[in-house]
């Protein structure tokens, strides 16, 4: 069998043997110093294409065969060799290779059957629609890569004429008022399209699908005053909504960052080149699913982003979820994520350009005795919010959940959680807080050691001896604590659930103090109104299961159950890694109860 090394295979001697490096892997084959001499003979021959027998012959001894076989086996195991005999299409001629060296090297690096892919791309028909500043760089790149079946439809006929004539491309003139050609004007049916709507961003997927076969690939290029978005590459019904959502989200990020606009016409040229490369890679089957690019800044930076579910329809119906005493029969229990997993989920929500939330630096927010974190909305909603925790990692998770609650539509209690169970429990606790009954009212008095710094800070700020009310819901063994301060710049209130009195009091004290500290920072967002439920973050699976049963049993005794409607998938990133949405109490026959957590709950400072 004839083997050829994929491009970009490098090797070097190391003390343990020979180091090899490929596009996506690196490893060491251990052995004596002589092993490098063997590799130094074999690798150049493999780059040209050779057989095992020819490698052994080049080394001059049959005794070298085991070593040759070992090197070959290690390279094949890491997909660094092509078996030319197993390919469905033979390698192209020397003339074709000389004409398209970069494209062939790219396909040989990435594809299992590179020459079959290249042959298919050579016969692909691509329609490019939009301004010449965008289309010409894309057309040149695609033509240079071997995709020569190109039709350009542009209102800039004169600007495109010389290039299209030189490259032998088809050119269709568009009027200034048209962004798409008439289907009858196309000389050949396109297999894929690149579309830059320019000022006309209102073209529907239906209009584009009239030009393209069912499921044909589309790469959009969109502009905003500050940024440009390239991609995602997908059928028009997904790609157009996905790109519209991406450019809107990226524009809000750029505006919030006070970014300078991308320079023209350089930005158009780069956007076109990136769009052409994305179209080529997607047709070849080597682009990452949902790959897109955002161009921004005076220095014109292009950031690659990923759209997990391009163009997810915002109108998709969300399936209602119910908090039952136990998971449904056969349902796999979902353990709470680890702290690192929770932070990773928040990171997915706050990625620049694509995330609906932005984690702010918070340099002005106090960090003692509590850690305070702030997030800003990047989804067209209102402002920013702050949350507290004992340390930064938990505060990062807490503020993301707070922001998701702030974005919840009515009706119901706005709730969020790390899992479906956590989200429903969060909503139920918020609703049940209004039903909790006081059983003790006093000054806070003595507290556990971790709460003492909170009391000292309140006293230093002129708010000593806050009043405490302890409450219980008849069906729960959790405690609800309410702390009210007096003195200072204004009174503050903190309400918090806890697994016991101590935890609830600590949460209420911390909430009241965090309200005071946040209020003193100019420009900072507010601490969210409502009851603090972050004790759920520290409740393990068994504690959550016990609470779930208590809540479900208490609701059933009242002829109710708790129902949640999860947030729909995000139009940019797809399904969110955290749960959120409205939770409400409904009668067991399914009709919502009139009494829900008030949207106008009394502000707590």
Question: How should each PLM-predicted stretch be described?
Answer:
Residues 164-180:
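N-terminal glycine-rich dinucleotide-binding loop that anchors FAD/FMN and/or NAD(P) in oxidoreductases
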């Amino acid at each position: 069998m004839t083997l050829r090394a994929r491009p970009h295979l490098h090797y070097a001697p190391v003390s343990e043997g020979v180091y090899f490096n490929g596009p996506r892997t690196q490893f060491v084959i251990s052995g004596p110093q002589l092993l490098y001499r063997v590799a130094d003979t074999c690798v150049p021959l493999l780059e040209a294409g050779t057989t095992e027998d020819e490698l052994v012959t080049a080394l001059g001894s049959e005794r070298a065969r085991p070593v040759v076989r070992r090197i070959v086996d290690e390279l094949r195991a890491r997909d660094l060799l092509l078996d030319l005999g197993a390919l469905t299409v033979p390698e192209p001629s020397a003339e074709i290779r000389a004409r398209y060296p970069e494209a062939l090297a790219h396909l040989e690096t990435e594809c299992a059957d590179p020459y079959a892919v290249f042959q298919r791309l050579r016969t692909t028909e691509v329609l490019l629609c939009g301004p010449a500043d965008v289309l010409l760089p894309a057309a040149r790149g695609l033509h240079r890569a071997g995709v020569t079946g190109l039709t350009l439809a542009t209102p800039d006929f004169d600007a495109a004429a010389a290039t299209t004539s030189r490259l032998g491309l088809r050119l269709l003139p568009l009027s200034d008022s048209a962004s798409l050609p008439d289907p009858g004007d196309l000389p050949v049916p396109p297999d894929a399209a690149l579309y830059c709507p320019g000022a006309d961003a209102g073209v529907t997927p239906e209009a584009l699908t009239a030009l393209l076969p069912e499921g044909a690939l589309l790469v959009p290029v969109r502009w905003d005053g500050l940024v440009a978005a390239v991609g995602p590459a997908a059928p028009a019904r997904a790609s157009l909504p996905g790109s519209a959502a991406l450019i809107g989200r990226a524009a809000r990020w750029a505006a919030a960052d006070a970014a300078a606009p991308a320079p023209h016409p350089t930005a158009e040229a780069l956007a076109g080149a990136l769009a052409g490369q994305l179209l080529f890679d997607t047709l070849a089957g080597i682009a990452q699913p949902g790959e897109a690019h955002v161009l921004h800044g005076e220095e014109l930076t292009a950031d690659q982003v990923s759209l997990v579910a391009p163009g997810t329809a915002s109108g998709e119906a969300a399936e209602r979820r119910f908090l039952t005493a136990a998971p449904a029969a056969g349902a796999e229990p979902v353990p709470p994520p680890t702290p690192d997993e929770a932070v990773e989920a928040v990171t997915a929500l706050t990625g620049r350009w694509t995330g609906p939330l932005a984690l702010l630096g918070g340099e002005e927010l106090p960090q003692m005795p509590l850690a305070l974190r702030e997030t800003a909305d990047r989804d067209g909603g209102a402002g920013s919010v702050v949350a507290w925790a004992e340390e930064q990692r938990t505060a990062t998770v807490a503020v993301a959940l707070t922001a998701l609650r702030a974005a919840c539509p009515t009706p119901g209690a706005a709730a969020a959680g790390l899992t479906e169970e956590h989200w429903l429990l969060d909503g139920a606790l918020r609703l049940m807080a209004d039903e909790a009954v006081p059983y003790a009212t006093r000054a806070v008095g003595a507290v556990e050691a971790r709460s003492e710094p909170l009391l000292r800070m309140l006293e230093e700020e002129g708010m000593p001896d806050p009043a405490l009310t302890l409450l219980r819901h008849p069906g729960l063994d959790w405690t609800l604590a309410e702390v009210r301060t007096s003195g200072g710049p204004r009174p503050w209130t903190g309400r918090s659930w806890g697994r016991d009195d101590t935890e609830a009091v600590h949460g209420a004290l911390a909430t009241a103090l965090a309200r005071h500290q946040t209020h003193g920072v100019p420009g900072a967002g507010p601490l969210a109104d409502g009851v603090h439920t972050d004790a759920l973050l520290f409740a393990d699976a068994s504690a959550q299961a016990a609470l779930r049963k208590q809540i479900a049993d208490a609701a059933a005794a009242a002829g109710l159950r708790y129902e949640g409607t999860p947030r729909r998938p995000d139009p940019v990133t797809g399904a969110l890694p955290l749960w959120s949405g409205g939770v409400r109490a409904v009668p067991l026959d399914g009709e919502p109860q009139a009494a829900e957590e008030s949207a106008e709950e009394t502000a707590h400072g």
